[in-house]
Regions:
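Hydrophobic/aromatic-enriched cytosolic interaction surfaces used to assemble or bind macromolecules
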Residues: 1-332
């Protein structure tokens, strides 16, 4: 399937970013403000609900985004992120070779997938000989392209959440003294899954999805669990070694131990977390449980105008901000 996939050319740092998960369209429109930041002009979420496809397309056309170049971001549930040993082939043959190599690792036939590849880490630190392979079902790509058509937008690039998260981590690191040290981010991408990424030198070195079970974000953990325990209430939380809550801590510990063994020259500087309305609570709890400096992933200094709206809508829109910082000009 021939598509405007992750690309190798620099992309303009302004415009429109959209994401479609089959139920809701999230969008962010922004432009540079001349001070190294992106001014968010508007953002929002349109849910299809009970609308027919025709009714929903009409509603999307009414958003007034016609003619704008759009970048698409796929959410983690819409693709697989794999890591493989780099095939010993010329760069122009990497995708073909990777397609053959991942055939036993993907959940459907490789002919039904669109692939792209990305080097792991930064070779200035150490050559890894590894590749990330992004595998997205053609059906997911077609669906999001149909929504873009309903918006009457031209899609320039299709990007993914992992790389958007990398961009945000790197931008925050630059504002805090540089990207030479490693930074981790733990982001709740759904009610039951966290995405852990570790970056350095503006590159993605490690990514992992941690499944936590349904209802993790509604469970009593962190401050809620501690408060309930102080009042003598029975709770499912970290103080009582709840399996669901402790799984996140255990899996992060495992990933950080692996990181220390694999990349001893890149000391982990900080961990940032994002969990919507419970971000501060998650940061406090994980900082205590992990023994690391854990801070909220705070984007407002980089994106003035990203304020207002419901917490649910903001949670769907904020990852799109990372696509606005995209500058994929490397070649494999």
């Amino acid at each position: 399937m021939k598509l405007p996939w992750m690309g190798r050319r620099a992309v303009r740092r302004h415009g429109l970013v959209i994401a479609w998960d089959g139920q809701a369209l999230a969008y962010v429109q922004a432009r540079p403000d001349g001070h190294g930041r992106m001014q968010v002009q508007r953002f929002g979420v349109e849910r299809q609900g009970e609308d027919t496809p025709e009714m929903f397309a009409k509603r999307l056309a009414g958003l007034g985004l016609k003619g704008l170049p759009a970048h698409v971001m796929l959410r983690p549930a819409q693709y697989q992120m794999l890591q493989i040993d780099a095939p010993a082939v010329p760069p122009e043959e990497l995708r073909t070779a990777a397609r053959w190599q991942i055939r036993e690792l993907v959940s459907q036939h490789v002919d039904d997938l669109t692939l792209d590849v990305l080097k792991v880490g930064d070779e200035k630190v150490r050559a890894t000989g590894s590749l990330f392979v992004v595998a997205a079902p053609n059906a997911e790509i077609r669906a999001v392209m149909q929504v873009a058509q309903a918006l009457r937008c031209e899609v320039d690039v299709i990007d993914i959440h992992d790389l958007a998260q990398r961009n945000l981590q790197s931008a925050l690191a630059r504002g805090q003294g540089g990207t030479a040290r490693a930074q981790a981010a733990v982001v709740m991408t759904s009610d039951n899954q966290a995405l852990l990424t570790i970056c350095a030198h503006d590159e993605l070195f490690y990514t992992r999805r941690i499944d936590l079970g349904e209802g993790f974000m509604q469970a009593a953990w962190g401050g809620e669990a501690q408060s309930a325990a102080e009042h003598g209430l029975a709770v499912s939380g970290p103080g009582q070694e709840s399996d669901r809550a402790q799984r996140l801590v255990v899996e992060i510990h495992r990933s950080l131990d692996l990181w220390d063994r694999t990349w001893p020259m890149l000391v982990l500087d900080r961990i940032a977390v994002q969990a919507g309305a419970r971000t501060a609570e998650l940061a406090l709890w994980l900082g205590r449980e992990l023994g690391h400096d854990v801070q909220p992933l705070e984007l407002s200094p980089l994106f003035p105008g990203f304020e207002g709206g419901s917490e649910e809508d903001r949670q769907l829109c904020w990852p799109l901000l990372g696509v606005l910082l995209r500058s994929e000009d490397r070649r494999l």
